[in-house]
Amino acid sequence: MSPKVQALIFIVGLITLLAAHAQEELSDNIESERGCSGAYKRCSSSQRCCEGRPCVCSAINSNCKCRKTYTELFKEYFGK
């Protein structure tokens, strides 16, 4: 392969890697700006759970926490 083709492939790969990393950081920033709570964090009517997780409260409607979905638990148990 010529050096020009190798350089082009390297540059395209680097741009792809950087774009994927930037997308991950952007999605994390959007969720934190939105004010949502992660798994096993406190939640309320004003502080929703991220990623559509359910907000589960105790019997007297206190100590509410975000729980993982069944899909997330299944993926953790059986691997991705």
From Swiss-Prot:
> Can you quote the domain comment?
The presence of a 'disulfide through disulfide knot' structurally defines this protein as a knottin.
Keyword list (alphabetical) reads: Disulfide bond, Knottin, Secreted, Signal, Toxin
Q: Which family does it belong to?
A: Belongs to the neurotoxin 02 (plectoxin) family. 05 (U19-lycotoxin) subfamily.
**Cysteines paired by S-S bonds:** C36-C50, C43-C55, C49-C66, C57-C64
CDD domains this protein is in?
Spider_toxin
**What is the name attached to this protein's record?**
U19-lycotoxin-Ls1b
Do you know which InterPro entries this protein is assigned to?
Answer: Spidertoxin (IPR004169)
Protein location? Secreted
